[in-house]
Amino acid sequence: MNILKHLLVLSALVLFISCAKKAPDLINLAQSNLDQNRENDAIENLNTLLDKYPNDSLASLAQYKLASIYKNWKNDPANFIKSLEKTVNNYPNSLHAKQAKKEIASFQDWIINNAETLRKRKLTSESINNLIYLVENFPQHELAPKAQYIVGDIYMNDLRDFEKALSEYRVVLSNYDGSKEEALAQFMIGYIYANVLKDFAAARKEYQIFLDSFPNHELHPSVKFEIEYLGKDINEIPALKHITS
């Protein structure tokens, strides 16, 4: 009986050893997962490698590959930057850490570019989420005003949610005064009231704020023209009358 028991234990041990995946197996399996667009499985296998073999020579590759998945497959800026930072902190002397440092330095630029790419692909919610992540986590960064302005632009031109667009443009005014996006946001607020909502009193007020605040802006002549002919039919505007004649 004891011999049988020992044989069963030995068989189970052999089976366990044969089934246990080593670091190279997990790396290869993760790549196979990605080739089949099974990124969640790839993430699981890479995390298994990092948990079981944190000091393996392939660990830095696994950590950096996680960052790549969050960047290129998941469009997940939070986990992307977290994975990059882990690559640098846990494997500081690796080639992957060197590359991760470069990507950390250009992280905010990547968010803007990725958001625009997502927008072109009609992945509007993902685009907005990327931009909001930048604004909320890096409010003092030089690209934060641009990110906030693009959010307003998406609501204006893509989603056609004009009240929300007004709200997002006003965030630019309140949080990023002095930025180049401030004047553009003020103009767009007046434009929406004048040309979309047809609230000419509100449009006049917002346009006047623009004229007073940005007297040297390139849009100044356009705003003066808009104010002069607010609410008028095209036939009542001498400069445009020829269009309908």
Per-segment meaning from a language model:
Residues 1-19:
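Sec-dependent bacterial lipoprotein signal peptides
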